[in-house]
C-alpha cells in the first residue's frame, strides 16, 4: 500500500486506478471543505483520509474536479517525495522552459488576469423537472441523467462556498498547490507541452516519459455515465480526458477527436494533444461562460484548426 492512512471507512479496496480515473467515489468533502487556507495541504489530505466515500470505490465514475488535487497529489508525494508543483517544475517546466506553475511565486502575481467565475453550488441542473418523470417513460441516457439529478453528486463535487473567502483571485489560492484546479500559465506553454507529448515525448534529446507510458495513459480506462456530470458519457484515461463521442454541436462539452488526450476546465479552457496529427492545442480564458455555451469559443477554434489540418 502506498497510502495506508487512506484505507479506512469503506475506502480499503481503493486502487490507484480508481484514483486516476475518477472512480474513487470521493468527488467531494462529506463535511464541506476544511475551513483553512488553501496552502494547508495536510488539512485537506487528512479530511479525505478520514471520511467515507460517497459511492463504493470502483463502482461508478464521478468527476473528482477538485479533490483529485489531494487524492492523486498525495499519492505522488508518498511515492516520489515531491509535491506535484515541485515535480512539475523540476521535470517539465524548467527543462522545457514552460511558463506554467502549480503554486505561483508571489513575484508573478502581477502577471495574472482577474478571473470572473460563477458559484456552481447554486446551479440548477438543466431539465431539473426530470426527477418527477417516471423512469419507464425515459430511455437509458435520460434515466442516468435523472439519477444524477436526484443524487446531487454535482453539488457535492462543486460545492464552492469555500471560494467566498479565498476565491480564484486571492493570493492564498494562487500561491497554493491545488494541482487539479489552480495551475497558472500561458496557452502557449500548454500547447507546447501537449505538442511535445504528441511527438514522441521528446524534444532536443530530452525524453519526458516513455512512449509506452503515454500510450497506456491515453487509452480509455473509464467510461460514463458520469454521476457528477449529469450522466454524461465522458471517457477518461489515466488523469486525461480522452476521445469523446459528444456531438461537436454541443457547446457544453469540449471537442476531443479520436487519438486526442488532454483536459477541459470548468471556465471553458481546453488543452489537448493530438497523436494522429502530432500537434498540441490550448485555449485559456478568464471568464466563465454560461453552462450551455461553456466551450463554445474553444470549440470554434478547434473546428477551425481541424479544417486547416484536413
Regions of interest found by a model, annotated:
Residues 118-187, 219-276:
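Active-site Gly/Thr loop motif
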Residues 22, 71-75, 177, 181-203, ...:
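Active-site-proximal alpha-helical segments within enzyme catalytic domains
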Residues 51-58, 68-70, 170-179:
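Flexible glycine/proline-enriched surface loops and loop-helix/loop-strand junctions
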Residues 19, 48, 64-92, 96-97, ...:
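Alpha-helical scaffold elements that line and support the substrate/ligand-binding pocket
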Residues 178, 199-202, 218-226, 291-310:
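Short, gly/Ser/Thr-rich active-site loops of penicillin-recognizing serine hydrolases
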Residues 1-27, 31, 49-50, 78-132, ...:
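Active-site helix/loop module of the DD-peptidase/beta-lactamase fold
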Residues 203-214, 229-231:
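Short acidic alpha-helical/loop segments enriched in Asp/Glu that coordinate divalent cations
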Residues 264-310:
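Structured C-terminal helix/loop/strand segments within mature extracytoplasmic catalytic/sensor domains
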Amino acid at each position: 500500500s502506498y497510502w495506508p492512512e487512506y484505507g479506512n471507512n469503506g475506502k480499503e479496496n481503493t486502487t490507484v486506478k480508481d484514483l486516476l480515473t475518477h472512480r474513487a467515489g470521493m468527488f467531494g468533502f462529506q463535511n464541506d471543505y476544511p475551513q483553512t487556507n488553501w496552502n494547508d495541504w495536510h488539512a485537506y489530505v487528512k479530511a479525505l483520509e478520514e471520511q467515507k466515500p460517497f459511492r463504493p470505490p470502483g463502482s461508478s465514475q464521478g468527476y473528482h474536479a477538485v479533490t483529485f488535487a489531494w487524492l492523486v497529489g498525495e499519492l505522488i508525494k508518498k511515492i516520489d517525495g515531491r509535491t506535484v508543483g515541485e515535480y512539475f517544475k523540476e521535470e517539465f517546466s524548467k527543462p522545457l522552459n514552460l511558463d506554467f506553475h502549480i503554486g505561483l511565486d508571489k513575484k508573478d502575481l502581477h502577471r495574472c488576469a482577474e478571473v470572473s467565475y460563477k458559484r456552481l453550488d447554486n446551479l440548477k441542473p438543466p431539465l431539473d423537472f426530470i426527477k418527477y418523470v417516471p423512469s419507464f417513460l425515459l430511455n437509458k441516457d435520460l434515466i442516468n441523467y435523472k439519477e444524477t439529478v436526484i443524487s446531487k453528486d454535482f453539488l457535492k463535487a462543486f460545492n464552492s462556498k469555500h471560494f467566498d473567502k479565498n476565491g480564484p483571485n486571492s493570493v492564498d489560492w494562487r500561491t497554493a498547490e491545488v494541482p487539479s484546479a489552480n495551475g497558472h500559465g500561458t496557452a502557449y506553454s500548454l500547447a507546447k507541452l501537449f505538442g511535445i507529448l504528441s511527438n514522441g515525448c521528446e524534444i532536443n534529446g530530452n525524453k519526458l516519459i516513455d512512449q509506452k507510458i503515454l500510450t497506456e495513459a491515453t487509452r480509455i480506462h473509464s467510461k460514463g455515465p458520469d454521476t457528477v456530470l449529469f450522466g454524461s458519457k465522458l471517457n477518461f484515461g489515466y488523469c486525461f480526458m480522452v476521445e469523446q463521442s459528444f456531438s461537436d454541436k454541443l457547446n457544453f462539452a469540449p471537442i476531443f477527436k479520436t487519438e486526442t488526450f488532454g483536459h477541459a476546465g470548468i471556465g471553458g479552457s481546453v488543452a489537448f494533444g493530438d497523436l494522429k496529427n502530432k500537434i498540441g492545442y490550448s485555449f485559456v480564458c478568464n471568464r466563465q461562460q454560461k453552462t450551455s455555451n461553456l466551450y463554445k469559443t474553444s470549440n470554434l477554434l478547434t473546428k477551425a484548426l481541424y479544417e486547416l489540418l484536413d
